[in-house]
Each structure stands twice: as C-alpha cells, then as structure tokens.
C-alpha cells in the first residue's frame, strides 16, 4: 500500500526493456504502462578517435542484445565514439540514444555516426575498467519507454616507448615507435640484442621473448633462440598483460654482416662516428690518420670531425663493403666576426 503522494517508477522485463515516469497516487489509482517491444539498438561499434580515422574499430566480445564487452587501449582519451546501428523498423527520428546519468543528457547521440563523442567514458592513460549504460529513449506519451545497452569497457595495456640495442650501439626501430604500430624492424650484425619496453601505465605484466621484465628494463635476447619468419628475420615478441588481456608487439631483427669502413683524415683531427640513435662508436683500430670501424652493412652512420674545438665537418653515410672515406678538415676561418646583445623594452 502507498500513501497518497507523487512517485517515480521504473518497470522492466528483467532484461533491457523499460518504462518509467511519475505517478500521482490517490485512493484507487491504477498504473497502466506499456514496455517497449523489439530491439531498438541492433549493434554497437566503438572507436577511440573521431570517425575512427587512426585506430579503427575496437575489438568486441560477448555481445548480446543488452550488452557487449569492448577492449579499449589505455592510451585512449576520455571520450569514445560509438556507432549505434538501429534495429529493423526503428523510428530514428523519435527514438534517440543517450548516455544514462549524463548531466548533459539533453544531447542525443546520432544513429550510425562515428563523429559524436560519448564524453567522460573512461580515464585517460589508465588501465581502469568502466561500465557505461546507454539508453535508446522514445520521447512523447505519458511515460518514457527506453531500452538499455551496457558497454563493458576493458582497458588493454600499451607501450609508451620501445628501444633496441646491441653491444655496439642503439638500434633504429623502423618505423619509429608509435601506439598505432605493433611490428618493428631493426638490423644488427651481433648475435644478441637488448630490448627495452616501457609501459604507458603501471600494473601491466611484461615479457620479452618469454622473459619477465619490468617497465624500462632491458632484456638480452639471443637471436639463436628466436623463431624466424619466411624472410629469415628473427622474431622477438614483447607481450603486455593487464585486466586479463594481452597485447603483443613484435620486433623483427635482420641479421646483417659487419663491414670495415675506413676514415682517412689529417693528423690531429678529432673524428667520431655516431649511430642513428646517437651512440658514439669506437674504432677497432686507429693509426692517427686512419680509423677503421666495423659497422653493420647497410645501416646509416654519421661522422663528426672537430678542429680546434669550434670548427666542425659532418657527413652521413650508409655502411658499404670496401668503403673508405676521406674526412675533410674543417675550415678554421672565423665566419662570425662579431656578436652583440642588447636589452629590448618589450612594454607596450
């Protein structure tokens, strides 16, 4: 029994179909409210950027008429971009989709659109999961009919950086690391490489070639222990696991021969050779006017010649068989004849 008053109610079929409203209860009041029929939200896809241009559609699983589980990377921003497909025969003019509990719920999400953001859905740069309930609402009538669809958002781990090195220098990843890419290639003439993965968020378990490691810690991998693909590249898997989900990055290592490169130069000239990662490489032999370096065939290097501290000559080159380079001595004339500075009154 209810005392006379105004009440709010929400009735459902125990699944996803609801009707709600307010009712003034007096003696003898009877409530008659009809639940919505059919399935208004046929399917939901999710992207993490406008129009899904960069990352495409996120993986989904365990999908039913009332809910679905979506794998959202930890680097996602707070807003998601859902694509709501209406059920057959749904009046999309009068039935619109909203985020339940959204204080700005007066803004409907468009049907079949990848451009309307579902704001404040997840935390940025986080492995924290979230549930978001969406409602397809039919406006008009005495009471509001609506159907719910729950987005279970499971966060997946990612790297913020990935580095490789051998015993000589750092190795250049191709392409440069980005969270849009999961496969990289490096080249080395050595039998071991060191892989250093850095996770974006704490809490992810990391393995490199099956060896457990911490974020930011290098792992030494023997190439002889690695599987090879059809192109004879050695495959090093880097696996991150969190929230029961694993994400795999692959480093493909091209084993190349090393080749001697000779740099001839004037006596007293300071010559250094750097890898593409900026590491200084020591010569295997030096006579004072000729330095020999064992470099990885086909990889790029730069020499920097210095005379009297302030004068330099620089040149980039790929290591080639039988290569001998003559390093020029920098011009030591002073091209800058004067330098002055003064204060400027920047007040308006």
Regions inferred by a protein language model and the residue ranges of each:
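Intrinsic-disorder/low-complexity linker and hinge segments
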Residues: 329-333
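Short, acidic Ser/Thr/Gly-rich low-complexity loop/linker segments typical of extracellular
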Residues: 1, 62-64, 274-295
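Beta-rich interaction/scaffold domains
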Residues: 2-6, 11-269, 276, 311-312, ...
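Extended non-catalytic scaffold regions that mediate assembly and binding
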Residues: 280, 325-327
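Amphipathic, non-membrane alpha-helical rod segments
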Residues: 11, 291, 295-298, 303-311
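Disulfide-rich extracellular modules and peptides
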Residues: 35-37, 282, 307
């Amino acid at each position: 029994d209810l005392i006379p008053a105004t009440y709010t109610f929400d009735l459902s079929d125990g699944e996803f179909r609801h009707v709600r409203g307010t009712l003034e209860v007096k003696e003898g009041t009877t409530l008659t409210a009809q639940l919505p029929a059919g399935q208004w939200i046929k399917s939901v896809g999710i992207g993490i950027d406008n129009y899904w241009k960069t990352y495409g559609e996120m993986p989904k699983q365990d999908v039913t008429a009332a809910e679905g589980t979506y794998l959202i990377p930890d680097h996602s921003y707070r807003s998601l971009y859902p694509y709501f497909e209406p059920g057959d025969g749904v009046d999309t003019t009068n039935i619109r989709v909203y985020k339940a509990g959204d204080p700005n719920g007066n803004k409907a999400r468009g049907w079949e659109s990848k451009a309307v953001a579902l704001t404040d859905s997840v935390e940025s740069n986080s492995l924290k999961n979230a549930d978001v309930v969406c409602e397809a609402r039919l406006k008009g009538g005495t009471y509001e009919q609506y159907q719910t669809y729950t987005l279970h958002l499971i966060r997946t781990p990612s790297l913020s950086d990935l580095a490789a090195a051998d015993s000589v220098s750092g190795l250049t990843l191709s392409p440069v690391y980005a969270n849009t890419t999961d496969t990289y290639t490096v080249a080395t003439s050595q039998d071991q490489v060191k892989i250093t993965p850095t996770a974006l968020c704490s809490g992810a378990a990391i393995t490199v070639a099956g060896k457990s490691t911490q974020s930011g810690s290098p792992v030494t991998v023997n190439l002889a222990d690695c599987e090879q693909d059809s192109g004879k590249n050695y495959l090093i898997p880097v696996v991150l696991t969190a929230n029961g989900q694993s994400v795999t990055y692959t480093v493909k290592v091209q084993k190349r021969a090393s080749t001697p490169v000779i740099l001839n130069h004037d006596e007293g000239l300071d010559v250094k050779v750097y890898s593409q990662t900026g590491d200084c490489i020591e010569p295997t032999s030096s006579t004072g006017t000729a330095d020999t370096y064992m470099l990885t065939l086909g990889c790029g290097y730069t020499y920097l010649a210095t005379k009297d501290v302030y004068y330099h000559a620089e040149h980039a080159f790929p290591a080639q068989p039988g290569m001998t380079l003559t390093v020029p001595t920098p011009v030591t004339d002073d091209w800058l004849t004067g330098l002055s500075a003064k204060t400027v009154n920047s007040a308006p």
